[in-house]
Regions:
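Small-residue (G/A/S/T)-rich helix-start motifs and N-terminal tracts that mark the onset
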Residues: 6-156, 160, 164-182, 186-314
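Proline/glycine-rich low-complexity loops and linkers
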Residues: 1-5
Length: 314
């Protein structure tokens, strides 16, 4: 439904963290995100379509010791309908990633020479780029983030270590010509905007809005009732998900879904809030089947087909 009902608005104030004086602003430019709302954004797949029809996602993720983040993001992207997945990783990760994600193609790079021509070529060809999941913050990772910001044509999704890298120089977010989506958890958001956790918790809605408008990026501020803010001031508050998702790796799954939807040429703001809704809906299915205690981020990926069945009306 358009806007937030009075009961839901009270829940938002209590659970999400919005100041009372901003409550009356919510109906005009803030909407709740329900699975039923996003279904019209997903057209039927073209019977004449091929893998190129559904986008080319480039992931620049993973590093020694953090291959799992890359694997989870990649599998989530593949379960979210992307046509081609290209993963740029250091040579050392190939023996781990190749058997874990057999559907992907790989662009291998030497960290001492990053980004390198192969990665730059992959950035040029991508319809969307996802950067940061398990990437680390070494000097070569900084160069990779800069290369994407300076050269990407399609939507750029920045998560995890990409945000930690940019915390020192958030003005770099103003560089890209392409749309940018950032997906910070509260700690990453505080590092980006220099505010305290107490300040953020006091008004999550305004925190996301101000950052989105200041840096012209779609801001996905994760948490209970994830807030998705556009540079225009338009805002969404997600209604799906549960505390069982509060485990390391859930954010990588969300990043993969977001990247996949962007690669399929969905409008960036719609892709951002749809991905959050789908991610939470998968989490709710997991909680029902496996319990909030026992569910894992990898279980979210396996529930994505059920969510897309609902979206397709089957």
């Amino acid at each position: 439904s358009r806007g937030l009902g009075d009961v839901y608005k009270r829940q938002v104030v209590r659970q999400v963290g919005i100041k009372e004086e901003h409550l009356e602003m919510l109906p005009c430019d803030t909407e709740s995100v329900l699975l039923g709302n996003i279904c019209p954004l997903f057209p039927k797949r073209d019977p004449e379509g091929h893998k190129g029809t559904y986008g080319r996602l480039l992931m620049i993720c993973g590093s020694v010791g953090m291959a799992g983040a890359c694997i989870m993001a990649a599998r989530a992207a593949l379960r979210s309908g992307v046509g081609l997945l290209n993963i740029a990783i250091p040579h050392a990760l190939y023996p781990i990633l190749a058997p874990a994600v057999p559907e992907a193609i790989f662009t291998l790079y030497d960290p001492t020479e990053a980004p390198g021509e192969a990665v730059l070529d992959a950035i040029d060809k991508a319809s969307a780029c996802l950067v940061g999941c398990g990437l680390g913050t070494a000097p070569y990772a900084v160069k990779l983030v800069d290369a994407v910001l300076e050269n990407a044509h399609g939507t750029v999704v920045l998560d995890a270590d990409a945000l930690n890298i940019l915390a020192k120089t958030p003005e770099k977010l103003l560089v890209p010509q392409a749309p940018v989506i950032i997906t910070p958890h509260p700690g990453e958001m505080c590092r980006l905007n220099g505010r305290t956790m107490a300040e953020l918790r006091a008004d999550r809605l305004q925190t996301a809005r101000v950052f989105a408008q200041t840096y012209r990026v779609i801001t996905v501020l994760k948490g209970a009732g994830t807030i998705i803010a556009a540079p225009s001031g338009e805002t969404r508050v997600n209604t799906t998900g549960n505390p069982g998702m509060a485990k390391g790796g859930s954010g990588d799954v969300l990043a993969g879904i977001t990247g996949a939807l962007c690669a399929q040429n969905m409008q960036p703001f719609e892709a951002a809030y749809s991905a959050v809704c789908i991610h939470g809906a998968a989490g709710d299915l997991c909680a029902e089947a496996l319990s909030q205690h026992g569910m894992l981020p990898t279980d979210l990926i396996e529930k994505l087909p059920q969510v897309f069945l609902q979206i397709e009306g089957k």
